[in-house]
């Protein structure tokens, strides 16, 4: 009887170990894939130079974006960048989720990929895993920015003001189109609510 119980326990323990090993393998695979996300600009796109982070930091409002799960359905999206003493950049993304009736926030960290006078950074919201963030076009007065990610499926139009003149928007979108971005898939972002943190 005790041998039978012992055998059952050993079998259960072995099953638990197998499940844990499967989970570990999945986690390692996810970490590997996340680590493979490129941090350099997409081929054919050059990040803005010269780039002044002191002028770039502060709050930006998202006017348009290509759809991704981490922002899906959000309105009133803003991104705030703050230079830290260690040279990194604190990133705070906020947006309103109408389906849940609540504000959502994600806090991350950005680091320069190369020279600090080039608008090419890598951003992480999940521990050691970074993705590319590249300022592909920038207003001389730092009033608007066109940002692309690790590939052309990531694109954002950012402005200092909540609302953007339609003619100016079309000019920025035309720049994105010239860079090979599928601008027909851009989603316009409304800004009708007041963020309680602002």
Where are the language model's segments positioned?
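A beta-rich soluble binding module of mature secreted/lumenal proteins
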Residues: 2-11, 32-198
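Bacterial N-terminal signal peptides
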Residues: 24-34
